[in-house]
Regions:
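Aromatic "clamp/platform" in nucleotide-sugar-dependent glycosyltransferases that forms part
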Residues: 170, 538
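Short alpha-helical donor nucleotide-sugar binding micro-motif in glycosyltransferases
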Residues: 517-518, 525-530
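Conserved acidic donor-binding segment of nucleotide-sugar-dependent glycosyltransferases
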Residues: 573-581, 589-595
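A conserved mid-protein helix/loop that constitutes part of the nucleotide-sugar donor-binding site
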Residues: 276, 456, 460, 465-479
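Glycosyltransferase donor-sugar binding loop
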Residues: 114-115, 141-142, 299-300, 435, ...
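Nucleotide-activated donor-binding/catalytic signature segment of Leloir-type glycosyltransferases, i.e.
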Residues: 133-136, 499-521
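Membrane-proximal helix-turn-helix segments that form the acceptor-binding/catalytic region
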Residues: 55-63, 96-103, 342-345, 392-409, ...
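Short hydrophobic beta-strand element within catalytic cores of glycosyltransferases
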Residues: 555-558
Length: 633
């Protein structure tokens, strides 16, 4: 279970990289596994105690979770590349769990503080959370308890059948008590310090602005200067000095773990396969402790302005850096690649990872400055029909730059691997894309929006550009004898003339449905309910839509280009690339033979999810970064 959690080690103490929502979700999802274990809510004071005391360090690092209560801890985590790190204060976690208890029916036990505080706490809880199941409360004496008293208290706690045991004894006493009694209690123990007093109203908490400015300690100091002055002065000064020293060492030791991604349009996005790949790999790299900066491109969203959403600076632990570009489609890609490349020179990256041939035009610049550069060739882009002569030559130049100067080249298909060997005598690393097994969705939204029922339609899903072959499918569909509909799902990609030609060719046929760009629930439903998925491309790198269609258990009909056949093997039907008559014949056969379609559907999902998975992709990508992936494999 601990493998699901991310940590940042601060002064030899593991601090969770999390936020309030993730913490609440984790507690509810893993409650049964957490029973008997304990959670520390850490701040600067407990972290310094852990640094100075080996026994207390063992207590801190043995817990199931160590939540960053103090703002300074989340700041340190962010400074070390854990960009999604945030605070999870104990006094805020308690109310969040109380709210969710209305639905979940959780039982809560409160151990610690004074009898007077517990009495007021009960009154406040009954007033603010009348649904809350208070399993019990106990204020232990200030003296050390005998073994018999300890056993009696644990027995009473267990008899009350709590889900959560909130412990407020103050540090280090509460952590040591939880450590001593772990796996003896039936609930999960959470040490929350002064949270009982804050919730009961017996002690005022620092205002939010002081918490944001890391001045909560100052507010507490003003409340009790005689007791806290020497502690805070010693602790805070020591923490700042030692963390600064540790940060310097951390940056030096973890330089190779900082990665820049260049070449996609933006993440999160489904504008193309490159965006999906960068998203999947980057997310998993951050989960493994790598620090990833994704250089997004501003400007026109190929699928429509309504999908050009504003994103924050952090997404799934990835730092998003947006590079401004011109609106002109002919200039924005090259300007983006140049500006992103200049920006990464100042980023102290261990790896600069270029995606697609276009961005590789600038690959020589970081190489000149001694940077470690990796290129992923998603396909031979210069061959695509949508590009004019000049654009094709620029893309070809990017390909040559990658072949000549990249420290490692990743390719998605054996066909492209052979091309690089034949054309440039350059060894490459074959790492195909991955896929996760999805959950099938009923046809709720597509029925409402498009009138589509299960097995009622043939599905095409890709950008509407010439090389994706939608025109072949439309022409073949017109010749079919069928009542099934044809769904053309996808946005354009700077191919407005082709897009217009497609719309003109289908406007008289009510059985051909143009959905435009789709994502989310509608996309999932289209995959889940199709009769046949058709992929008629002339050119591909490794089509993510084909992997996705098979993962949903679809019967697939694909053009017989090597990149498609390599993926599907004998688990899909193929037709001669660009041959409308052959495509029509194969489609008619599948329409008339439901048992054949059913047979393909039964095999496709298990086959594709077993053959390709993202964790394997990331394993091999990391190996490629550091030079031990094995060339040509």
């Amino acid at each position: 279970m601990k493998n699901d959690l991310r940590y940042c080690k601060i002064l030899n103490t593991n601090i969770n990289v999390t936020n309030m929502k993730k913490t609440v979700d984790y507690l509810t999802d893993h409650l049964e596994e957490l029973r008997g274990d304990y959670i520390c809510v850490s701040n600067v004071h407990t972290t310094m105690m852990s640094f100075r005391n080996k026994d207390y360090n063992r207590v801190q690092n043995s817990c199931a979770m160590a939540l960053p209560d103090g703002k300074p801890l989340s700041i340190v985590c962010k400074a070390r590349g854990f960009y999604d790190a945030d605070r999870v204060p104990g006094p805020d976690l308690m109310p969040e769990m109380f709210k969710i208890s209305k639905e979940k029916g959780y039982r809560h036990y409160f151990y610690g503080s004074s009898q007077e505080t517990l009495k007021k706490l009960r009154e406040e809880l009954n007033r603010n959370y009348p649904w809350l199941n208070i399993a019990g409360m106990y204020s232990p004496p200030y003296r050390a308890l005998t073994q018999a008293e300890e056993e009696r208290i644990i027995r009473e706690i267990n008899d009350s059948k709590p889900d959560f045991i909130w412990v407020a004894l103050g540090a280090p006493k509460q952590e040591e008590w939880m450590y001593r009694h772990r796996f003896q209690v039936r609930g999960v123990m959470i040490g929350v310090g002064a949270a009982f007093d804050f919730c009961a109203g017996t002690v005022r908490r620092a205002p939010a602005w002081m918490q944001e400015l890391c001045l909560e300690w100052l507010y507490r100091l003003m409340q009790d200067p005689q007791r806290l002055f020497s502690r805070y002065f010693s602790t805070n000064i020591s923490f700042l000095f030692k963390v600064a020293k540790e940060n310097h060492e951390y940056k030096r030791e973890n330089k190779d773990k900082k990665i820049a991604m260049i070449g996609h349009k933006r993440i999160p996005s489904r504008e193309g396969g490159v965006e999906i790949v960068v998203d999947e790999i980057s997310t998993r790299l951050t989960e493994r402790g790598y620090h990833v900066d994704a250089y997004n491109r501003s400007g026109y969203h190929v699928s429509g302005k309504e999908f050009d959403e504003k994103r924050g600076k952090i997404y799934n632990g990835i730092r998003l850096i947006t590079i401004p570009t011109f609106k002109s489609s002919s200039l924005n890609a090259i300007v983006y690649a140049l500006l992103a490349t200049i920006r990464v020179l100042f980023g102290q990256y261990g790896i600069i990872h270029y995606h697609a041939e276009g961005s590789c035009v600038m690959l020589g610049i970081p190489k000149f400055f001694g940077k470690h550069v990796v290129a992923t060739i998603h396909g031979l882009d210069w061959q695509r029909a949508k590009w004019g002569n000049f654009a094709s030559r620029v893309l070809k130049y990017g390909e040559k730059q990658a072949a000549k100067k990249a420290d490692a080249i990743i390719v998605l298909s054996r066909n492209v691997q052979e091309y690089f060997k034949d054309q440039y005598n350059r060894e490459t690393i074959f790492i195909p894309n991955g896929i996760d097994k999805p959950c099938l969705k009923e046809n709720r939204e597509i029925l409402k929006c498009f009138g589509l029922r299960k097995n009622d339609y043939i599905l095409f899903l890709a950008r509407l550009v010439p090389e994706k072959g939608a025109h072949y499918l439309i022409e073949a569909y017109r010749q079919l004898k069928t009542e099934k509909k044809l769904v053309i799902a996808g946005g354009d990609s700077h191919a407005s003339e082709y897009m217009e030609r497609i719309y003109q060719s289908v406007k008289e046929n009510n059985n051909i449905i143009m959905t435009g760009f789709v994502q989310g629930r509608i996309l999932e439903e289209l995959y889940s309910n199709a009769y046949v998925f058709v992929q008629p491309s002339d050119i591909e790198g490794m089509a993510m839509t084909l992997l996705e269609a098979m993962s949903y258990g679809n019967c697939c009909l694909v053009s017989n280009i090597p990149e498609n056949i390599e993926v599907v093997e004998d688990k899909a039907m193929s037709f001669q690339k660009g041959d409308v008559a052959d495509l029509k014949e194969k489609l008619q056969y599948l329409l008339e033979n439901e048992s054949v379609v059913r047979n393909y559907k039964e095999k496709s999902s298990a086959f594709i999810c077993g053959k390709y998975n993202w964790e394997d992709v990331v394993d091999r990508t990391v190996q490629a970064y550091f030079g031990n992936a094995g060339e040509g494999k």
